Amino acid sequence: MTLSGSSSASDMSGQTVLSADDADIDVVGEGDEPLDKDSECGSPAGHAEEADELGGKEIARSPSGSANEAEGKGESQQQEGMQNKPKNSLVKPPYSYIALITMAILQSPQKKLTLSGICEFISNRFPYYREKFPAWQNSIRHNLSLNDCFVKIPREPGNPGKGNYWTLDPQSEDMFDNGSFLRRRKRFKRQQPDSLREQTALMMQSFGAYSLAGPYGRPYGLHPAAYTHPAALQYPYIPPVGPMLPPAVPLLPSSELSRKAFSSQLSPSLQLQLSSLSSTAASIIKSEPSSRPSFSIENIIGVSAASSIAPQTFLRPPVTVQSALMSHQPLALSRSTAAIGPILSVPTNLISGQFLPTAAAAVAKWPAQ
């Protein structure tokens, strides 16, 4: 600390002496500036600082320059590669498959082509589809079969070859707007001819309850009155088809069959036969021995109720009689006799043996109390 202090003091004294001498010579003080500049330039510290600054600038400039040069070389190489590389990326044509098929059919002399002919035209006309073949062939096939604007024509017997011909529907000529294949109007739908429509209406009316015009077969939103076609008036002799199976016949007692409302429709002989059958069944039930256990239907609701329930349990009216009850229409005597005769001709002993259980079997089934 003493050395630095003494040196600084001597410097200060030297500066004061020089300043005092210079005060007489140079009053303005212009001579100080060149002295300072010369001292700064002549000092080694100043040279070192300048060298460091220049070196830093050169280092800062050198990476950016090398990066720019590398980018320029990379771009030039890419451009050269693009020029030397062939153009394989082809653009897909802006036409739909329907438009392509229509082009192929219209350019043919006979206005009809097979599937292979349509694909050949598209491949020759558009290089994009030539490279992608046969990936789009199924799309052409689906468009031919799903669109009404294309009509399939069977191949003639004498014309050898494979596949059917396809042509355009005459009513679909204006499906493209102003003849431009880029703009297509709404989806074309083939109209049904009037003659075919009348035949369809006749078939629908002739099927009756199972027809498409029935309550469960007509299209949604159409009233049944909409199907009153003139064909029904032209052919009044075609009856509607009734149900294939008769309705289910519930079991009715013989007393129900012998009521006034129904007995007036049957002949006296049938009434006598039915009444005799019911009385025979009742007598068989009453004649059973009373050696039954205490728990029985007779003890709960009485013997009279059991006798009235027994015919209801074991007797079943014929189908024709029940249908007469349901429809309230008189039956012919011959049909009724032919239908009921086999049932009424069965002997009573067979009925009692087959349908009525014996007392011994009934006792064996119930536990003894």
UniProtKB/Swiss-Prot annotation:
<dbReference type="GO" id="GO:0050769">
    <property type="term" value="P:positive regulation of neurogenesis"/>
</dbReference>
<keyword id="KW-0221">Differentiation</keyword>
<dbReference type="InterPro" id="IPR001766">
    <property type="entry name" value="Fork_head_dom"/>
</dbReference>
<dbReference type="GO" id="GO:0060351">
    <property type="term" value="P:cartilage development involved in endochondral bone morphogenesis"/>
</dbReference>
<feature type="compositionally biased region" description="Acidic residues">
    <location>
        <begin position="21"/>
        <end position="33"/>
    </location>
</feature>
<feature type="compositionally biased region" description="Low complexity">
    <location>
        <begin position="1"/>
        <end position="13"/>
    </location>
</feature>
<dbReference type="GO" id="GO:0048485">
    <property type="term" value="P:sympathetic nervous system development"/>
</dbReference>
<dbReference type="GO" id="GO:0043565">
    <property type="term" value="F:sequence-specific DNA binding"/>
</dbReference>
<feature type="region of interest" description="Disordered">
    <location>
        <begin position="1"/>
        <end position="89"/>
    </location>
</feature>
<dbReference type="InterPro" id="IPR030456">
    <property type="entry name" value="TF_fork_head_CS_2"/>
</dbReference>
<dbReference type="InterPro" id="IPR050211">
    <property type="entry name" value="FOX_domain-containing"/>
</dbReference>
<keyword id="KW-0678">Repressor</keyword>
<feature type="DNA-binding region" description="Fork-head">
    <location>
        <begin position="92"/>
        <end position="186"/>
    </location>
</feature>
<dbReference type="GO" id="GO:0003677">
    <property type="term" value="F:DNA binding"/>
</dbReference>
<keyword id="KW-0524">Neurogenesis</keyword>
<dbReference type="GO" id="GO:0097066">
    <property type="term" value="P:response to thyroid hormone"/>
</dbReference>
<keyword id="KW-0238">DNA-binding</keyword>
<dbReference type="GO" id="GO:0048484">
    <property type="term" value="P:enteric nervous system development"/>
</dbReference>
<dbReference type="InterPro" id="IPR036390">
    <property type="entry name" value="WH_DNA-bd_sf"/>
</dbReference>
<dbReference type="GO" id="GO:0003700">
    <property type="term" value="F:DNA-binding transcription factor activity"/>
</dbReference>
<feature type="compositionally biased region" description="Polar residues">
    <location>
        <begin position="75"/>
        <end position="87"/>
    </location>
</feature>
<protein>
    <recommendedName>
        <fullName>Forkhead box protein D3</fullName>
    </recommendedName>
</protein>
<dbReference type="GO" id="GO:0006366">
    <property type="term" value="P:transcription by RNA polymerase II"/>
</dbReference>
<dbReference type="GO" id="GO:0007422">
    <property type="term" value="P:peripheral nervous system development"/>
</dbReference>
<dbReference type="GO" id="GO:0010629">
    <property type="term" value="P:negative regulation of gene expression"/>
</dbReference>
<dbReference type="InterPro" id="IPR047392">
    <property type="entry name" value="FH_FOXD3"/>
</dbReference>
<dbReference type="GO" id="GO:0014034">
    <property type="term" value="P:neural crest cell fate commitment"/>
</dbReference>
<dbReference type="GO" id="GO:0005634">
    <property type="term" value="C:nucleus"/>
</dbReference>
<dbReference type="InterPro" id="IPR036388">
    <property type="entry name" value="WH-like_DNA-bd_sf"/>
</dbReference>
<dbReference type="GO" id="GO:0030318">
    <property type="term" value="P:melanocyte differentiation"/>
</dbReference>
<dbReference type="GO" id="GO:0001755">
    <property type="term" value="P:neural crest cell migration"/>
</dbReference>
<dbReference type="GO" id="GO:0048937">
    <property type="term" value="P:lateral line nerve glial cell development"/>
</dbReference>
<dbReference type="GO" id="GO:0050768">
    <property type="term" value="P:negative regulation of neurogenesis"/>
</dbReference>
<keyword id="KW-0539">Nucleus</keyword>
<keyword id="KW-0805">Transcription regulation</keyword>
<dbReference type="InterPro" id="IPR018122">
    <property type="entry name" value="TF_fork_head_CS_1"/>
</dbReference>
<comment type="function">
    <text>Transcriptional repressor that is an essential upstream regulator of neural crest determination. Also acts in a negative auto-regulator loop by inhibiting the transcription of its own gene.</text>
</comment>
<dbReference type="GO" id="GO:0050935">
    <property type="term" value="P:iridophore differentiation"/>
</dbReference>
<dbReference type="Pfam" id="PF00250">
    <property type="entry name" value="Forkhead"/>
</dbReference>
<keyword id="KW-0804">Transcription</keyword>
<keyword id="KW-0217">Developmental protein</keyword>
<dbReference type="GO" id="GO:0045892">
    <property type="term" value="P:negative regulation of DNA-templated transcription"/>
</dbReference>
